[in-house]
Amino acid sequence: MNLTPREKDKLLISMAAMVARRRLERGVKLNHPEAIALITDFVVEGARDGRSVAELMEAGAHVLTRDQVMEGIAEMIHDIQVEATFPDGTKLVTVHEPIR
């Protein structure tokens, strides 16, 4: 299987998001990379499902709460920018203050 660097990045993010979901199910608080991966995966999959950029910008800010991440993580992440593939092309989605 020959994957492009972009495809490899998508798979890595997807796998990290799976790990993050399993940890949340066990009640483990997420660290910085896990939180980023989970929100990024949410946006990428939402784009594939046909949701709008505006909808994902809003919904992406409700994927995680402060109680689900380690202390100080919410303050470290101000914006997450995701280049996602929508039915009408690739667009940049910015989620502002993603952990509230």
From Swiss-Prot:
Pathway: Nitrogen metabolism; urea degradation; CO(2) and NH(3) from urea (urease route): step 1/1. GO terms for cellular component: cytoplasm. CDD domains: Urease_gamma (cd00390). It catalyses: urea + 2 H2O + H(+) = hydrogencarbonate + 2 NH4(+). Keywords: Cytoplasm, Hydrolase. It comes from the Bacteria. Its main location: cytoplasm. GO terms for biological process: urea catabolic process. It is found in: Cytoplasm. One of its GO terms (molecular function) is urease activity. Its EC number is 3.5.1.5. Belongs to the urease gamma subunit family. NCBIfam families: PRK13241.1 (NF009712), urease_gam (TIGR00193). Heterotrimer of UreA (gamma), UreB (beta) and UreC (alpha) subunits. Three heterotrimers associate to form the active enzyme. HAMAP family: Urease_gamma. This is Urease subunit gamma.
